[in-house]
Curated annotation (Swiss-Prot):
The keyword Transferase does not apply. Coiled coil: none annotated. This is Cuticlin-like protein 19. InterPro entries: Cuticlin, ZP_dom. GO terms for cellular component: Golgi apparatus. The keyword Signal applies. Residues 1-20 form the signal peptide. Its main location: Golgi. PANTHER family: CUTICLIN-LIKE PROTEIN 19 (PTHR22907:SF59), GH04558P (PTHR22907). The lineage of its organism: Eukaryota, Metazoa, Ecdysozoa, Nematoda, Chromadorea. Interacts with vps-51 and vps-52. The gene is cutl-19.
Length: 237
């Protein structure tokens, strides 16, 4: 049985002994395991031609700086209590694509509780905040591992990453999400409008070499050479 953000207490009376299963779950410390990220690509053809970006989710110890998750990362043998603050950090190693974190869950693979919707916004703020995007390929959120299953040893965490190319006009409407009611829509619009990465990748200026070739092709020396060739042809006729 999974306990999710509500009080559930079964009282079993043996003479004068009262056993509260909820209390046991609350006091239980468990390990955490991050599942392999599920990747979704908006344009398979573009992704195939440029290679698949590598993305990862890391969990960090409690800290209030959710924009960077600057606290140390949890180690394999660390355990978490019900009230442990956790910073989720998502990173994709790419300069050509933007990511959106969506459909995240915690619990066990067979009995999971979703904490992010498929639009990238939180389902329950008491469990996880909506991710904050500091760039097109980095996001972070603060949450608690407030899900317990009886006899659970490890809490599993899984997420989906949706990738779109920065030059795809639809990409700007996909990520970062503007519908999460986190007062960051204006920041995300500015991220797109002022991005030098998008400008250089999608609207590159002509290179210096191209300019030199263009100027040389229109130079007066070339015109003089053409005139001389015409005169020689005329005299030899």
């Amino acid at each position: 049985m999974v306990e999710y953000n509500r009080i559930f207490c079964v009282l079993v009376i043996f003479s004068t002994t009262i056993k509260c299963e909820y209390s046991e779950l609350m006091n239980q410390k468990i390990g955490v395991r991050v599942e392999v990220l599920n990747m979704i690509y908006e344009n398979e053809t573009t992704i195939t031609s440029t290679g698949h970006p590598r993305c990862r989710l890391t969990l960090h110890k409690s800290g209030w700086d959710r924009d960077t998750c600057s606290s140390p990362q949890f180690k394999l043998n660390d355990t978490l209590s019900w009230s442990t603050r956790v910073c989720y950090k998502w990173v994709c190693d790419t300069t050509k694509y933007a990511m959106r974190v969506e459909s995240c869950w915690i619990g066990s693979p067979n009995m999971s509780v979703y904490i992010l919707r498929d639009d990238g916004c939180t389902i329950e703020k008491a469990i996880l905040t909506s991710p904050v995007y500091t760039s097109f390929n980095r996001a972070a959120a603060i949450g608690w591992m407030a899900v317990r299953q009886k006899n659970m040893k490890y809490m599993h965490v899984g997420c989906t990453i949706r990738l779109c190319h920065l030059c795809d006009p639809k990409c700007q409407t996909i990520t970062p999400p503007r519908t999460c009611n986190d007062n960051r829509a204006d920041d995300y619009e500015a991220m797109w409008n002022s991005s030098s990465r998008v400008k250089n990748l999608c609207f590159p200026e002509p290179s210096t070499t191209e300019n030199l070739n263009l100027n040389f092709g229109n130079s007066p020396f070339q015109n003089v050479g053409n005139i001389i060739i015409l005169l020689l042809v005329f005299l030899l006729r």
